[in-house]
UniProtKB/Swiss-Prot annotation:
The gene is bkdC. Forms a 24-polypeptide structural core with octahedral symmetry. Part of the BCKADH complex, consisting of multiple copies of BkdA/BkdB (E1), BkdC (E2) and Lpd (E3). This is Dihydrolipoyllysine-residue acyltransferase component of branched-chain alpha-ketoacid dehydrogenase complex. The lineage of its organism: Bacteria, Bacillati, Actinomycetota, Actinomycetes, Mycobacteriales. Transmembrane segments: none annotated. Induction: Up-regulated upon nutrient starvation. Is also highly up-regulated in a DlaT-deficient strain. Part of the bkdABC operon. Keywords: Acyltransferase, Lipoyl, Transferase.
Length: 393
């Protein structure tokens, strides 16, 4: 095989879910490195998740298709690899066989030799890029074996701060969130309604099950009651559509419940599909799984799309009240404030009770004030007397 014939081009793979571009967050190889089949070439960030892309060939890296931070289209050249018999020496002295095993193969590999690139984990390289720290200038880090650590990068950034701004590129999850929020603000005429809810019975119910079913949290119980209220007030679980036949409201048969989850990568919205078909334990377990997956970065794109109604639980961050932005193109979003003891009037006396503020922001083209009032009052009543509604526990 001639030199040119042995060079294989590997394009950015189609990662599914309609994604059209990726951002290269970290290269694990450099030009001149030897790679083996299924060895990680780089990490890329999409609008949904961060994934590692493995090599389908064994050989030597000839060219990289972009630098860290570059945005590459699906199908664009990611790397060029020389798979010729002289490119990589095998343990038995024979030439390597250029074998394409397909994206995501499970073949075990050994790490190939590296060039003299600074030693740092992908997340540290990403931080260094955001802070404009040259890893090569650090030479050797304080970690084991000279690995450059997060502390090394932060120390270098503090020492080299100039008069200019800290420029941080927006891509991946952050870019997708910004796009949806901007679209929501531009296209949806919103209004809001709030109610204060006494949560004493909700917390008592949670306490009864905390030992046997710790996943049944006040948040999970509230979501289950929300699903009940949405099934009785279906207009909140809908979407405004400008079709060729004129404006339409699409009322969704299934409640696909999204909820905001703050992660190191930004705000994610995991989705509980067909929440109306789950009992309280099933819903609570699924919510716990999705929260864990969001924090660990293991959610699939399918678990982050398709919501018909979204909940913003800013109360989990200690915030009493707020006005969330509708997750376009949904018709409404519900904000949950923190549950705290607050003064309320009971039987003519002021007493302390655990309360929570619920705020519904809604698309006023789809829903009118009376419909939202009915929905919010029903949800308040369910939360204040939850036991009968949750007989499926």
């Amino acid at each position: 095989m001639s030199g040119e014939d042995s060079i294989r081009s590997f394009p950015v793979p189609d990662l599914g879910e309609g994604l059209q571009e990726v951002t290269v967050t970290c290269w694990s190889v450099a030009v001149g490195d030897d790679v083996e089949i299924n060895q990680t070439l780089c990490s890329v960030e999409t609008a949904k998740a961060e994934v590692e892309i493995p090599s389908p060939y064994a050989g030597r890296i000839v060219e990289l298709g972009g630098a860290e931070g570059d945005v590459l289209k699906v199908g664009a050249e990611l790397v060029r690899i020389d798979t010729g018999p002289t490119a990589v020496a095998q343990p038995n002295g024979e030439g390597a066989v250029p074998t394409l095993v397909g994206y995501g193969a499970d073949t075990a590999i050994e790490t190939s030799r590296r060039t003299s690139r600074p030693l740092a984990a992908p997340v540290v390289r990403k931080l260094a890029k955001e802070l404009a720290v040259d890893l090569a200038a650090l030479q050797r880090g304080s970690g084991a074996g000279g690995v450059i650590t997060r502390a090394d990068v932060l120390a270098a950034a503090r020492g080299g701060v100039g008069a200019g701004p800290d420029v941080r590129p927006v891509h991946g999850v952050h870019a997708r969130m910004a796009e949806k929020m901007t679209l929501s603000h531009k296209e949806i005429p919103t209004a809001k309604a709030s109610v204060e809810v006494i949560c004493a019975e909700l917390l008592r119910l949670r306490d009864r099950f905390v030992s046997a079913a710790p996943e049944i949290t006040p948040f999970a119980l509230t979501l289950r009651l929300l699903v009940i209220a949405l099934k009785h007030n279906v207009i909140l679980n809908s979407t405004w559509v400008d079709s060729g036949e004129g404006p339409q409201v699409h009322v969704h048969r299934g409640v696909h419940l999204g909820f905001g989850a703050a992660t190191e990568r930004g705000l994610l919205v995991p989705v509980v599909t067909d929440a109306q078909d789950k009992n309280t334990r099933e819903l609570a377990s699924r919510v716990a799984e999705l929260i864990t997956g969001a924090r660990e970065g293991t959610l699939t794109p399918a678990e982050l799309r398709g919501s018909t109604f979204t909940v913003s639980n800013f109360g989990a961050l200690g915030v009493d009240d707020g006005v969330p932005v509708i997750n376009h193109p949904e018709a409404a979003i519900l904000g949950l404030g923190a549950i705290k003891p607050r003064p309320v009037v009971v039987g003519g006396e002021v007493v302390a009770r655990p309360t929570m503020t619920l705020t519904c922001v809604f698309d006023h083209r789809v829903v009118d004030g009376a419909q939202v009032a009915q929905f919010m009052c029903e949800l308040r009543d369910l939360i204040e007397s939850p036991e009968t509604a949750l007989l499926d526990l």
